[in-house]
Each structure stands twice: as C-alpha cells, then as structure tokens.
Design a protein with these regions (language model features):
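Conserved phosphate- and dinucleotide-binding cores of soluble alpha/beta proteins
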Residues: 1-139
Length: 139
C-alpha cells in the first residue's frame, strides 16, 4: 500500500483486492499504511518483475559537485535529510557518505541510491529525529 491517500480510500471501498508479489520492495509502514488480511476480499498472487525504477539522474556536473561541497559544509551532525533525483542530490549524497557526519536521519519522498551509500557508510541512525526516531521514512 502507498503512503499517501489510499488508507482513506480503503475505508470507503466496497471491495478490497490486493496483489501479493514477492518481487516488489517492501518497507515498514506507519499507522494506516498497512491493511489487515481480514479486511481483504480478494488476493491475487503475482510474480511480475518490480515496477521499473526511475533513473538516478545521471552523473553530477562540475557545478553540481562545487555546489554540493558548499551544501555539505552546512549540514550538522544529527540533521534529517531529504534528497531528490539528479546530479546535485547524487553529489550531495556522495559527499555525505564520505564525510565525518554522524547520527543522520532520513525523512524523504524518494529513497534514492545516495541514501544506500550514506547508510552503508554508517551515517544514518535517526537518533536525533524528533519524529519517527530511529526510522528512515520515505514514501
């Protein structure tokens, strides 16, 4: 289920049909983002490939890298991050992964590859977040 308005739609639905597909990614949801199987009328099992991913936005340009250096210098330990798609966010994410920053949080719409690099570098733990402490939140 999506992290948007679908929970409200389910409350008004006459029938609820879900597809279970082991090839689709799954993320732990917050209240209202999951559905109890007892509320489901029909289950369709599928093994279709995952929905095509968006491109990563390409390699950062020299300007992207220069601006990213200025941005990363302003990020404090414990900051909560949001990154988008494109050369600039890729450059920012790469520099964060290589930095001395720590205790970072994630609260973002899109979980882009740069977040994987930052997480693998041990920079993300969400310890300082006021909301959803310890969790990486994405839609």
């Amino acid at each position: 289920m999506s992290a948007s308005h679908l929970a409200d739609m389910l409350d008004k639905a006459r029938h609820i049909i879900v597809e279970v597909n082991r090839n689709m990614p799954w993320g732990f949801g917050l209240n209202g983002s999951e559905i109890n199987i007892k509320d489901v009328d029909f289950v369709v099992e599928g093994d279709d490939p995952a929905i095509a991913e968006l491109g990563g936005g390409g390699e950062p340009s020299a300007v992207d890298r220069a601006v990213a250096e200025l941005i990363v210098k302003e990020i404090p330990n414990g900051a909560c991050l949001q990154l988008g798609i494109g050369g600039m966010p890729n450059a920012v994410g790469s520099l964060i992964a290589q930095s001395d920053l720590k205790d970072l949080g994630v609260h973002t719409e899109m979980y882009v590859d740069a977040f994987v690099d930052i997480a693998m570098a041990g920079k993300i733990n969400g310890r300082c977040k006021n909301l959803d402490k310890g969790r990486q939140v994405y839609a």
